[in-house]
Amino acid sequence: MTKYILPLILLFCSIGFLAANIIAETKINKVTGEIGILKATAEPALVYGQHKETRQYVTLEVENKGEPQSVYIQIDGIPYEQIALNSGINQIETSVPETTERKNVSLSIASGSSILAEQAVKSYPVKQWTVYMVQHSHTDVGFTKSQTEVLTDHIRYIDYVVEYCERTENEPEELKFKWLCEATWPVIEYINNRPKEQVERFIKYIKNGQIEITGMFFNMSEMIDENSLKTFLEPIRQLRALDIPVKTAMQNDVNGIAWCLADYMPDLGIHYFSMGQNDHRALRPFECPTVFKWESPSGKSSYFYRFDHYRTGNRWGISDKNATEMAPSVFAYLNNLTEKGYPFDAVSIQYSGYHFNNSPPSLVPNAVIREWNEKFASPKLRSALFHEFMDYVVERYDAQLPVIRAAYPDWWTDGFGSAARETAVSRTTHADMIATQGLLSIASAKGKPLPQGIHEKIRHIHTNLIFYDEHTFGAAGSISDPRGESSQTQWEQKSSYAWEAFKNAQVMQETAGGLIQTNMPRGGVPTVTFYNTLNWERSGVVELFINNEIIPRNRDFKLVDAIGNKLTTQLLRSNREGSHYIAYAENIPPMGYKTYRVITGEEEATPLPQLSIINNIIENDYYKIAIDTNNGSIKSLFDKDLDVEMIDSESPWLLGAFVYETLNNNRRQLEQYRLTEYTRESLVNVQVRPGHDGALYKSFFIEGDCNGVEKRSGVKIEVRLFNNEKRIELIYTTRKLPHLEPDGIYVAFPFKLDDAKLFFDVQGGTVSSGENQIEGSASDWNTVQNFVSVRNDNSQFILGSREIPLFQLGGIRTGQFQRQKTFNHPHVYSWVMNNYWTTNFRAYQEGEFSWSYYLTSTDNTSNATATRFGWASRVPLHGRVMPAGKANDYPVDYSAFSVDGENLLMTSCTPSKDSGYLLLNVRETDGKKTAFTVKDQGGKLHEFQIVNAIEEPLSDVTTSDLFAPFENKFIKLKL
């Protein structure tokens, strides 16, 4: 004990001597006026004192108007340390004793016998923080450089990462170089394109805990559909084969995420989500970074961390400052967390090696972390992997984490409206691939061997769709320099993904049809076979092109089934090669087909009569429509079955109105979270002309002029009222002028329905606008997969578009940025085009573009009804025409299998990678526990197994299962 007493005595004596000298002179000269403490701040940090005790870190801003001098800092009148003051403003670091309660501490500056300046500082208990610093490179497929450069850079970065891991593997855990691979895309390319020994080094440091692989291909918008998400997750299969663990799904920059991933990821063993959100033109959910339990519609749970920006650490200065220079930013951040009630003693921060996207890794931040931890006892910085932070939080705070069962809609998909044509191509191809993979599944069920390499071709198409749907749309200078080389070349590359997918999907659809046609019934007359690739029996309109060789032009014909029942048909248009018809195909079996004979008459076809429009009113058995000829819209839509008027006549824009908007050349206002400078206008010089009064539908045309589009073509709107089903279609065509100034196009659907709510479908489920969506997620506009529903207890109106994904619900809401969405009227606006961004997305679009809407109304208010109408409209029946041939006795109809339950939706069916199996993705839509079985056409039960998205088994083989409410499952079906 004696060895400690003597040093303490000497210490107290020296302090007492120093204090006595200063205090003795206090009365002579307390303040000179040349030195002043401008600011004294007790920071949320601890440092080590002169005897390794922990003390609260304090920063002082001291002004010295005189000459440089040496002074002492006193704490509550007791001298603590000597410092040098330069002339001018001095930034001083000192400390006060750590405290367990809030209190004022007196800080003074003394020189010799004088107290030169004095100020109280508020000391408080310091929270012991650990900051998990996660280094990564944000993967933009373009933006900062061309798409062709990005992948090679990221592959090379992994080489650097391996070197840095090796260099630091013997450091303490918190100082080892650690790296998070944000996307699986470059990881898989690295594995496939590096020598075996280099890949083995890479895997070594994954297993050494220095590299973390995440589970998402890259940062994805909500444009992607559930079918393509299987390909999006496919790299996990290859990672599994190499025994590479994947615990995390990471989404950076994007302000939302597909809800179905909350179902898919836990079954893949991925229980952590992270989102480094970018609040440019977007709200950020939650007051501060938040860990919560994110539930899928069925209640499947994962842990979700909403980061701040994905380069917050760079904003602090981790990549270009020292510890002292970085400290104010760190302390301000932690103080802000405390003020907002952040509940944990640890926080995770993302950063890159350098302060830009697609950054290479760097060891510099590790040196800063070392310097920081040598200086500060708290907060401690750790070089970390993301899952380490989540492991820490879940282990200590699991019971208090909030539970959120809600969708997370994305704010940034509005930019896809800057390329309406290519976005429409992407959406059309997604829908076509659902049908095509269904056709391949039917072929497999019939025992047809699939073409060699078919799975790789499917993957290639979906990969191209993924690259188009991915969040990086173009160059950083796409708006400021739209005609520059970078903007032009990046857009050419981006758009090529959509067109490449579309082209190959068309070929694959023909391949699939060709596989099945060898088992089609044939005979002495031509045939038409209608295919249904969804899981319920369907009837609907199918467009057919039939050569003049099969049906001579203007010749009467009929399509009849095996017992002579005739389908309703209608001519659309003809050319020198043949004619386009539509037919109403009836009762086509689920996952199957039905064949009709083409019987050609000797008489000429009766010309279609022209529709009679009286007093601008058109009606059929279901609806009565009144046209507003002033601005080319529908002012009344009366449902005869429901006995309701569907349109709000008080709306400034009536149903179908073409609304052209300009922002007075001020696109920056949306970055200020407002839209106050704008003009909106509709059609002028409107003309209404009749179309045909056909057997399948009646039609009329509205034509008019409008700013923003080519004058000689104007805007053409065709409205079709169908006779065989309760359905209206609106088809728009215009030629957009290439304006660089911000402008946009909406189409109005101002519905009227008392006490109505607004619903829309996303990947994985149905969202009630403003209700089961995370507060602060996209509320001005939403990305719709297949339908919008206006619904009360008695009725629902169902609307959708095959081409256009963006809808605004509750009115034109651009610029409102409502954190908790509310609306007064169930008005719906389709947002067709815009160029409102200041970067990344397109500055203009031009040329002819056609798009369409489908609409119905019903007294059935279920999700299942809306879902089936929307899906059947986006994924229509397909028809295949064959000439007369050698007669055979193949059956005229066929169903590979059926799934009972109108509330069970099969979102996709594709041949499994294992021969003799199909992979189905099925979800329950109405919130009901539902028994699940699969039967063949004869009623025999199929065996199946519950698997995950990459076909790993989750259950034993069975013939029945139970779906929980809203549950989503992958089914591996044995043929």
Question: Where are the language model's segments positioned?
Answer:
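Surface-exposed loop and adjacent secondary-structure segments within mature catalytic domains
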Residues: 201-208, 258-321
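Metal-dependent polysaccharide deacetylase catalytic core of the NodB/CE4 family, i.e.
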Residues: 141, 173-177, 181-252, 300-308
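Bacterial Sec-dependent N-terminal signal peptides
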Residues: 1-24
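An acidic-aromatic substrate-binding cleft motif
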Residues: 116-155, 160-167, 176-177, 265, ...
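Active-site and substrate-binding clefts of carbohydrate-active enzymes
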Residues: 132, 137-140, 289-517, 533, ...
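C-terminal (or distal) subdomains of carbohydrate-active enzymes
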Residues: 51, 261-264, 288-290, 510, ...
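CE4/NodB-like, metal-dependent polysaccharide N-deacetylase domain
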Residues: 229-267, 332-351
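Mature N-terminal, pre-catalytic/accessory segment of carbohydrate-active enzymes
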Residues: 20-140, 148
